[in-house]
A protein has these predicted regions:
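Conserved short-loop catalytic and cofactor-binding motifs
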Residues: 22, 57, 153
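Cyclic nucleotide-binding regulatory domains
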Residues: 26, 51-113
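Histidine kinase transmitter module recognition
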Residues: 45, 76, 97, 127-130, ...
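Conserved active-site beta-strand element of glycosyltransferases/polysaccharide synthases
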Residues: 117
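A generic structural signal for short hydrophobic patches within well-formed alpha-helices
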Residues: 93, 124-125
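Cyclic nucleotide-binding regulatory module and flanking cytosolic helices
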Residues: 2-48, 93-94, 98-101, 130
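Polybasic "coupling" helices that flank or enter modular domains
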Residues: 129-178
Length: 178
C-alpha cells in the first residue's frame, strides 16, 4: 500500500537516532539494538499545507510522529460544519486511536507543510509485546492527547471569539517553533 505523501524513503538508523523529536517520540525509550531491528519499517511522509494525512473512517494502519509542522484534527457537525478538536505539533502522535483497532476518528489536515514518520501498527504491536516500556510510553501519549483535548474544551471553545483567538495565538507561540 502506498502511503499518501510518502517520499518512499526509509529513514536510516543514523537519521532516526539523531532526530530532533526522538526524545519525545513513541520509541524514545527503546534500546538501540531493538531500534536497529525495526527502524526500516518507518517511512518519511511529507504532506503539503491543506492536504490530508488521513480521513475519518479510514482503516488505521499507521501512527504518525510529527517531526515538523502543525496538523489540525477535525470532526464534522451534522450540518457539515467543520470543528477543530485539536492541533498536533512537533513530537505529537497522530492516529493514536488506531492502536486500539479503531478507524481514524478525525480528518488530519496539515495547517503547514508537515514532516512525519509513518509507523506501521504491526511494528507497534510487535514491539509492544517484547518491550514493556513501549506500553507505558503509549499510555503517556494517550494521556497527553486527553489533556490537550481537555485544554481545548476549557480554553479554546468557550468565551468571546476575541479571547479564544488570543488563547489560540498564545498556544501557538508556546508550542511551535515556526
Amino acid at each position: 500500500m502506498t502511503i499518501p505523501g510518502s517520499k518512499g524513503e526509509i529513514l536510516t538508523n543514523e537519521i532516526c537516532k539523531a532526530c530532533s523529536v526522538r526524545s519525545v517520540a513513541l520509541f524514545k525509550d527503546l534500546d538501540l539494538e531493538v531500534f536497529d531491528r525495526f527502524h526500516s519499517a518507518i517511512r518519511e511522509v511529507e504532506i503539503g499545507k491543506g492536504d490530508h494525512l488521513y480521513n475519518i473512517g479510514d482503516t488505521g494502519e499507521r501512527v504518525y510522529t510529527i517531526r515538523k509542522g502543525i496538523i489540525k484534527l477535525v470532526q464534522y457537525l451534522p450540518d457539515g460544519t467543520q470543528r477543530i478538536v485539536r492541533l498536533l505539533k512537533q513530537g505529537d502522535l497522530a492516529g493514536i486511536e488506531a492502536t486500539t483497532g479503531s478507524t481514524y476518528q478525525h480528518d488530519a489536515i496539515a495547517l503547514t507543510t508537515i514532516d512525519t514518520c509513518a509507523i506501521p501498527l504491526k511494528t507497534v504491536e510487535m514491539l509492544a509485546t517484547e518491550q514493556p516500556q513501549l506500553h507505558k510510553t503509549l499510555l503517556s501519549k494517550w494521556e497527553d492527547a486527553l489533556s490537550t483535548s481537555d485544554s481545548w474544551l476549557t480554553r479554546l471553545s468557550t468565551g468571546p471569539s476575541r479571547y479564544r483567538v488570543i488563547r489560540l495565538l498564545i498556544w501557538l507561540a508556546e508550542n511551535t517553533s515556526e
